[in-house]
Amino acid sequence: MGAVWLSHVSQLVCGCYLIEQSSCVLRTFHWSLSHSLNFTLTMKPKRRRLGVKMESFSLATPNMCFRKVSSELDSSFNGENVVCGLELEEKTAGDRNRIHFLEERNEETLSKRLRKLSRLDKVRSALELFDSMRFLGLQPNAHACNSFLSCLLRNGDIQKAFTVFEFMRKKENVTGHTYSLMLKAVAEVKGCESALRMFRELEREPKRRSCFDVVLYNTAISLCGRINNVYETERIWRVMKGDGHIGTEITYSLLVSIFVRCGRSELALDVYDEMVNNKISLREDAMYAMISACTKEEKWDLALKIFQSMLKKGMKPNLVACNTLINSLGKAGKVGLVFKVYSVLKSLGHKPDEYTWNALLTALYKANRYEDVLQLFDMIRSENLCCLNEYLYNTAMVSCQKLGYWEKAVKLLYEMEGSGLTVSTSSYNLVISACEKSRKSKVALLVYEHMAQRDCKPNTFTYLSLVRSCIWGSLWDEVEDILKKVEPDVSLYNAAIHGMCLRREFKFAKELYVKMREMGLEPDGKTRAMMLQNLKKHQK
């Protein structure tokens, strides 16, 4: 027999014999005792196994307790103290793994076995094989180590996972996948911020950075997305491009989703341009995000293009995507395209909801088709196509305001109140404005009084509309009462003076102008011009 090289081992058990050994080398023994000779002659080759009991990895990296890893992860990651700096604790003797005598010594073959055991989640068998290879000086390849590392993490054995990682690091057997797995482990134990700190420390060392690949960058970007760290996401994306890495479908989908979710739609569009240049397609979820980004950036043509590409690929855009696209096209005044998308929405089997109808009403309103807005609203209401909300009522009332349909506006207001919906100040303002346009000053005042009775607080726009309405109705006392009730507001005085000059009530205009100056309010240029132009005429 040749020499079998071992590290320091306190006890060796061969069959039923216990041999105390303190040296590093166990050489061939010449058995002098007869029972020893008989044992040697009768030993079967299949049972040639060194029953060396030892603690897993206790030769160079003792077992550790991971419950104190948090304090270490708070410090900077320097590669040397990820594992060694942790507080180590000896485990009980009952938790010892067995080192097997391996007949096979081919590292590639053993690596394949380790990969197979790891994929089957045979944790104990994989651990014994890994220990045995390491004990005999054999090194699994990086693929096998990563597979084993992933197996340990899947089964929650974080302690051994960090030990294996330290072994790989010392043997310079790490890859980008290795770092990716460990970033995920750190994120689970300590949080995403700690994992990102570890990533930044890795970036600072060129030797480690040479192992970076797209998978690792994807992991770091994903961690940023978990905590909505848009600035770090953008930085990692720029660094990845600077290193010459081309993103994958996952990379661009992550970037688009994060940027849209964090309100950086302009960056999402930049990502999309880069993706198109690299001839990479987005995933379905990222396409939804891009349609949303295009809506915010008023890129309706790009949103429509993405929507059409989804249909060509056999995808079924959801109702939210259809509504978003309709809204985008409606804001651009593309009414024809709006109703084409609506037809597609129906063909996909979606049932239009209140957002769909509001987008359609808004599209008609943007196209100045106010009569069509009211006609569609009446159809929605009469056929109970959806539950009417404040937005639908307001869209109808603003169309009434544009057309001067004060009666219909008042009717919709009372209907809205009767339905139990909360009527906002803006809704009352629309009705008062409709009365103003129709020269129904007294009706406007009644709506204002009704508004006050319902404890709805008026705003500056309410008073502006009331002042203009009362001036056109020659209700000068009411104008004066309104100005007395509210806090001094330069816009109200300017509007009142403009109206009075237009109605040729220069006396009242001059009184308001003097009062305005006494209160320290600064008139605008139009007010000054009107007063200078008509002051002499009024004095005569």
UniProtKB/Swiss-Prot annotation:
<feature type="repeat" description="PPR 7">
    <location>
        <begin position="318"/>
        <end position="352"/>
    </location>
</feature>
<dbReference type="Pfam" id="PF13041">
    <property type="entry name" value="PPR_2"/>
</dbReference>
<feature type="repeat" description="PPR 5">
    <location>
        <begin position="248"/>
        <end position="282"/>
    </location>
</feature>
<feature type="repeat" description="PPR 12">
    <location>
        <begin position="489"/>
        <end position="523"/>
    </location>
</feature>
<comment type="similarity">
    <text>Belongs to the PPR family. P subfamily.</text>
</comment>
<feature type="repeat" description="PPR 8">
    <location>
        <begin position="353"/>
        <end position="387"/>
    </location>
</feature>
<feature type="repeat" description="PPR 6">
    <location>
        <begin position="283"/>
        <end position="317"/>
    </location>
</feature>
<keyword id="KW-0677">Repeat</keyword>
<dbReference type="InterPro" id="IPR011990">
    <property type="entry name" value="TPR-like_helical_dom_sf"/>
</dbReference>
<feature type="repeat" description="PPR 4">
    <location>
        <begin position="213"/>
        <end position="247"/>
    </location>
</feature>
<feature type="repeat" description="PPR 9">
    <location>
        <begin position="389"/>
        <end position="423"/>
    </location>
</feature>
<feature type="repeat" description="PPR 3">
    <location>
        <begin position="177"/>
        <end position="205"/>
    </location>
</feature>
<dbReference type="InterPro" id="IPR002885">
    <property type="entry name" value="Pentatricopeptide_rpt"/>
</dbReference>
<feature type="repeat" description="PPR 11">
    <location>
        <begin position="459"/>
        <end position="487"/>
    </location>
</feature>
<feature type="repeat" description="PPR 2">
    <location>
        <begin position="141"/>
        <end position="175"/>
    </location>
</feature>
<protein>
    <recommendedName>
        <fullName>Pentatricopeptide repeat-containing protein At3g29290</fullName>
    </recommendedName>
</protein>
<feature type="repeat" description="PPR 1">
    <location>
        <begin position="106"/>
        <end position="140"/>
    </location>
</feature>
<feature type="repeat" description="PPR 10">
    <location>
        <begin position="424"/>
        <end position="458"/>
    </location>
</feature>
<dbReference type="Pfam" id="PF01535">
    <property type="entry name" value="PPR"/>
</dbReference>
